[in-house]
């Protein structure tokens, strides 16, 4: 795994989506993005690879504010869909939403909603 390029991609997605941090959510009202997996889709004779990287985007909030959490994550998804990421070392990046926000954790005070984002791109070597 090339942690450097994945960190750069996560930072660009964080910037484009207005996400608070890279990692996990730790406080109400916070959003976060974290690496969730990758795969090589195709290899070419010149050493170029078409890759797919998946990130999980999460938001945490009070139980009575679930609608706001979903709207926040949908807004981040729209920002990704309307953007053109600029990432050094990759070309022709495209971003798509793999899953809409769903509740992934709940206790008596808070919910965490998560959606999945996939970025496909070409990379030399």
Q: Can you annotate each of these PLM segments?
A:
Residues 1-23, 38-125:
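Charged, amphipathic alpha-helical segments and their flanking helix caps
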């Amino acid at each position: 795994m090339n942690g450097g390029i994945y960190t750069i991609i996560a930072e660009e997605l964080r910037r484009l989506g207005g996400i608070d941090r890279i990692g996990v959510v730790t406080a109400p009202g916070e959003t976060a993005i974290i690496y969730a997996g990758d795969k090589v889709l195709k290899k070419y004779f010149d050493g170029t690879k078409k890759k797919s990287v998946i990130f999980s985007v999460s938001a945490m909030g009070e139980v009575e504010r679930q609608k706001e959490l979903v709207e926040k994550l949908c807004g981040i998804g729209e920002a990704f869909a309307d953007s053109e990421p600029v990432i050094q070392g990759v070309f022709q990046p495209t971003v798509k939403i793999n899953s809409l926000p769903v509740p992934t954790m709940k206790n008596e005070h808070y919910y965490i909603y998560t959606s999945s984002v996939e970025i496909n791109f070409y990379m030399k070597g």
